[in-house]
Amino acid sequence: MKQGKSNTRKAVKKSARRTTALGRTSKGFTAEERAAMKERLQELKAPKGKGDGESAVLAKIAEMPEPDRTMGERLHAIIKASAPGLSPKLWYGMPAYARDGKVVCHFQTAQKFNTRYATLGFSDQANLDEGGLWPVAFALKELTAAEEARIVALVKKAVS
Protein backbone atom coordinates (compact mmCIF):
# COMPACT_ATOMS: atom_id res chain seq x y z
CA MET A 1 0.00 0.00 0.00
CA LYS A 2 2.72 2.49 0.89
CA GLN A 3 4.36 1.87 -2.45
CA GLY A 4 1.10 2.85 -4.23
CA LYS A 5 0.90 6.12 -2.34
CA SER A 6 4.50 6.91 -3.18
CA ASN A 7 3.82 6.44 -6.89
CA THR A 8 0.74 8.64 -6.64
CA ARG A 9 2.73 11.44 -5.03
CA LYS A 10 5.36 11.24 -7.73
CA ALA A 11 2.67 11.44 -10.39
CA VAL A 12 1.15 14.50 -8.74
CA LYS A 13 4.52 16.27 -8.46
CA LYS A 14 5.29 15.90 -12.17
CA SER A 15 4.62 19.12 -14.03
CA ALA A 16 2.86 19.29 -17.34
CA ARG A 17 5.24 18.95 -20.24
CA ARG A 18 4.62 19.59 -23.87
CA THR A 19 6.53 18.58 -26.94
CA THR A 20 7.81 21.42 -29.10
CA ALA A 21 7.94 21.45 -32.89
CA LEU A 22 11.56 20.29 -32.67
CA GLY A 23 10.56 17.26 -30.59
CA ARG A 24 12.02 18.62 -27.35
CA THR A 25 9.96 18.72 -24.19
CA SER A 26 9.54 21.99 -22.35
CA LYS A 27 7.93 23.18 -19.16
CA GLY A 28 5.80 26.25 -18.79
CA PHE A 29 5.01 28.93 -21.33
CA THR A 30 6.31 29.26 -24.86
CA ALA A 31 8.47 32.24 -25.83
CA GLU A 32 5.46 33.71 -27.66
CA GLU A 33 3.24 33.35 -24.58
CA ARG A 34 5.88 34.98 -22.36
CA ALA A 35 6.22 37.86 -24.85
CA ALA A 36 2.43 38.38 -24.86
CA MET A 37 2.38 38.48 -21.05
CA LYS A 38 5.21 41.04 -21.02
CA GLU A 39 3.28 43.17 -23.50
CA ARG A 40 0.19 42.96 -21.30
CA LEU A 41 2.21 44.07 -18.26
CA GLN A 42 3.49 47.09 -20.21
CA GLU A 43 -0.08 47.91 -21.27
CA LEU A 44 -1.25 47.85 -17.65
CA LYS A 45 1.61 50.14 -16.57
CA ALA A 46 1.04 52.64 -19.40
CA PRO A 47 -0.70 55.91 -18.53
CA LYS A 48 -4.37 55.94 -19.45
CA GLY A 49 -5.93 58.66 -21.55
CA LYS A 50 -8.42 59.31 -24.32
CA GLY A 51 -7.08 58.60 -27.78
CA ASP A 52 -4.05 56.66 -26.56
CA GLY A 53 -5.69 53.36 -27.47
CA GLU A 54 -6.35 54.27 -31.08
CA SER A 55 -2.79 55.45 -31.72
CA ALA A 56 -1.34 52.39 -29.96
CA VAL A 57 -3.51 50.04 -32.05
CA LEU A 58 -2.59 51.80 -35.29
CA ALA A 59 1.10 51.70 -34.36
CA LYS A 60 0.86 47.97 -33.57
CA ILE A 61 -0.89 47.30 -36.88
CA ALA A 62 1.84 49.27 -38.72
CA GLU A 63 4.48 46.96 -37.15
CA MET A 64 2.78 43.80 -38.45
CA PRO A 65 4.30 41.88 -41.36
CA GLU A 66 2.22 41.41 -44.49
CA PRO A 67 -0.42 40.06 -45.04
CA ASP A 68 -1.38 40.59 -41.38
CA ARG A 69 -0.84 44.37 -41.66
CA THR A 70 -3.32 44.80 -44.51
CA MET A 71 -5.80 42.51 -42.77
CA GLY A 72 -5.36 44.41 -39.48
CA GLU A 73 -5.92 47.78 -41.18
CA ARG A 74 -9.06 46.50 -42.89
CA LEU A 75 -10.42 44.88 -39.70
CA HIS A 76 -9.77 48.09 -37.76
CA ALA A 77 -11.81 50.07 -40.30
CA ILE A 78 -14.61 47.46 -40.34
CA ILE A 79 -14.88 47.28 -36.55
CA LYS A 80 -14.77 51.08 -36.11
CA ALA A 81 -17.51 51.53 -38.73
CA SER A 82 -19.68 48.64 -37.48
CA ALA A 83 -19.41 49.44 -33.76
CA PRO A 84 -18.40 53.07 -33.20
CA GLY A 85 -19.05 52.63 -29.47
CA LEU A 86 -16.07 50.27 -29.11
CA SER A 87 -12.75 51.78 -28.06
CA PRO A 88 -9.53 50.47 -29.62
CA LYS A 89 -6.85 49.34 -27.18
CA LEU A 90 -3.97 46.91 -27.00
CA TRP A 91 -4.60 43.63 -25.21
CA TYR A 92 -1.66 41.25 -24.78
CA GLY A 93 -0.01 43.18 -27.62
CA MET A 94 -2.96 42.60 -29.97
CA PRO A 95 -5.41 45.13 -31.39
CA ALA A 96 -8.60 44.85 -29.36
CA TYR A 97 -11.88 46.72 -29.14
CA ALA A 98 -13.55 47.32 -25.79
CA ARG A 99 -16.83 48.56 -24.35
CA ASP A 100 -16.59 50.18 -20.91
CA GLY A 101 -12.98 48.99 -20.65
CA LYS A 102 -13.83 45.32 -21.27
CA VAL A 103 -12.57 43.68 -24.47
CA VAL A 104 -15.33 42.56 -26.84
CA CYS A 105 -13.17 41.42 -29.76
CA HIS A 106 -9.51 41.23 -30.77
CA PHE A 107 -7.28 40.48 -33.74
CA GLN A 108 -4.43 38.01 -33.36
CA THR A 109 -1.92 37.85 -36.21
CA ALA A 110 -0.72 34.55 -37.60
CA GLN A 111 2.80 35.60 -36.68
CA LYS A 112 1.91 36.24 -33.00
CA PHE A 113 1.87 32.56 -32.05
CA ASN A 114 3.33 31.13 -35.28
CA THR A 115 0.04 29.82 -36.62
CA ARG A 116 -1.02 29.37 -40.22
CA TYR A 117 -3.88 31.88 -39.97
CA ALA A 118 -4.82 35.08 -38.17
CA THR A 119 -7.72 35.04 -35.72
CA LEU A 120 -10.63 37.35 -34.98
CA GLY A 121 -11.69 36.47 -31.44
CA PHE A 122 -14.60 37.49 -29.24
CA SER A 123 -14.74 37.57 -25.44
CA ASP A 124 -17.58 36.66 -23.11
CA GLN A 125 -18.61 40.34 -23.35
CA ALA A 126 -19.76 39.73 -26.94
CA ASN A 127 -23.45 38.92 -27.42
CA LEU A 128 -22.90 36.01 -29.80
CA ASP A 129 -24.79 33.37 -27.80
CA GLU A 130 -26.72 30.89 -29.95
CA GLY A 131 -28.25 28.16 -27.83
CA GLY A 132 -25.73 26.05 -25.95
CA LEU A 133 -22.87 26.25 -28.47
CA TRP A 134 -21.39 29.08 -30.57
CA PRO A 135 -17.99 30.04 -31.97
CA VAL A 136 -15.91 32.72 -30.27
CA ALA A 137 -12.93 32.79 -32.66
CA PHE A 138 -12.66 32.80 -36.43
CA ALA A 139 -9.65 31.89 -38.56
CA LEU A 140 -8.75 34.49 -41.19
CA LYS A 141 -6.65 33.61 -44.23
CA GLU A 142 -7.89 36.51 -46.34
CA LEU A 143 -10.54 39.22 -46.32
CA THR A 144 -12.85 39.13 -49.30
CA ALA A 145 -16.17 40.97 -49.56
CA ALA A 146 -17.93 37.86 -48.19
CA GLU A 147 -15.69 37.67 -45.10
CA GLU A 148 -16.01 41.42 -44.54
CA ALA A 149 -19.82 41.20 -44.65
CA ARG A 150 -19.76 38.33 -42.14
CA ILE A 151 -17.43 40.28 -39.82
CA VAL A 152 -19.71 43.34 -39.98
CA ALA A 153 -22.67 41.15 -38.97
CA LEU A 154 -20.69 39.45 -36.17
CA VAL A 155 -19.42 42.73 -34.72
CA LYS A 156 -22.88 44.32 -34.83
CA LYS A 157 -24.37 41.27 -33.11
CA ALA A 158 -21.54 41.25 -30.54
CA VAL A 159 -22.37 44.78 -29.40
CA SER A 160 -26.17 44.48 -29.67
Question: What are the language-model segments listed below?
Answer:
Residues 1-160:
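Charge-dense, helix-prone N-terminal extensions
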